[in-house]
Amino acid sequence: MNKRVKIVATLGPAVEIRGGKKFGEDGYWSEKLDCEASAKNIAQLIKEGANVFRFNFSHGDHAEQGERMDVVRMAEDLAGQKVGFLLDTKGPEIRTELFEGDAKEYAYKTGEQIRVATKQGIKSTRDVIALNVAGALDVFDDVEVGKQVLVDDGKLGLRVVDKDAEKREFIVEVENDGIIAKQKGVNIPNTKIPFPALAERDNDDIRFGLEQGLNFIAISFVRTAKDVQEVRAICEETGNGHVKLLAKIENQQGIENIDSIIEAADGIMIARGDMGIEVPFEMVPVYQKMIITKVNAAGKIAVTATNMLETMTDKPRATRSEVSDVFNAVIDGTDATMLSGESANGKYPVESVRTMATIDKNAQTLLKEYGRLDSSTFGRSSKTEVVASAVKDATNSMDIKLVVALTESGNTARLISKYRPEADILAVTFDEITQKSLMLNWGVIPVVTEKPASTDDMFDVAEKVALHSGLVESGDNIVIVAGVPVGTGGTNTMRIRTVK
């Protein structure tokens, strides 16, 4: 059995070589990127099980990210395997401003009172911490007395005790000993802030990524379906309507609007880092299970992300609780699990991918016994859906080694994946765009071949591609799914065939 759960690995300096130096060595950043050596490292990640690489546009400029994408293309050639490219937007966020003078950080004690300035374009001092808000918004009127302000992923908590309308400042009380450094993330839980759906920087980043031929966009801090629709409009305007959009759910508003967001997006990324700050932490696993269940029912992509193997940023082995976390995400029904800092700037990127692949593969063998997916509740709303359901029944009741789905758009393979058949799904596509769009779908192994000329050719091509893949051998039973006649645009045929 192949690994059916996909792995998203975030790229960064952890796998990049500069002037013969590894990340963390003196003078690393002053050296030029060694593309060939870096490509070898990334190829190793592919061989260990990485299916999609995430380019985090919260860090680095277009030149750096573009060079990184070029290196991944080199790595594809070295590994002899295609991967997906995912752009993760910076999104609308709040950060602490730069400090006056040479200060890098300020330390605070529990019970201290300081001020937080919401007026834009000023620098921070020890007594007045200024906020840099996406879209240059002044959030003074949006935050009520009694609200909590969390800095640097919640490492320091501040409580608003009063407001100074004249200066546009909050008076806050420090809730725990801690440090505030420049340009650290700020969260204000249970507060609706009227961010623009798409910041100017995100617009520029998305257009750049589309020019580079990316396959997926993860849209940060999605609150409503409109946020997804704005990105979709850019993709369609630039002739990139095929790019798949993942809505990152990171706050209460996104959770409240989850049904309409799922309908608008191609998938959901459950970004548990910011979510765990924006909502009560004990609700994060509840929301994870709820969202995955809804996404599964819609036949879309579910990606579970953030802190999955966090310990492996610094240590060669995961904790038992991290192993359980990854395992349970698979049992919940996730299509993909994601590595962030572990593969981007950690000490053990290769080991992190290998560990995640091992857990994913073990968990998928127990889906039938412990999995939460109940396909009997899915609606059969189309001929293709009926065929996809029949494919699962066939793999459950017969000795079927492989499902072969001939698909122009990829939709046939996606629907079959939705039902989680008991066999791998070989998606036979006719162009690389469709092939790469399937890199996140559970159980799908996408390949490219020439389009068959006739219906008879179609089934012969399916068998030949299956044999060539090494997934079956002579005498094995396969299920072939296709649309007849060729090019009809719909799936209406399922044929069980013994490989000759």
Name every feature range the model reports, one short phrase each.
Residues 1-500:
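Non-catalytic helical/linker scaffolds that mediate oligomerization, partner binding
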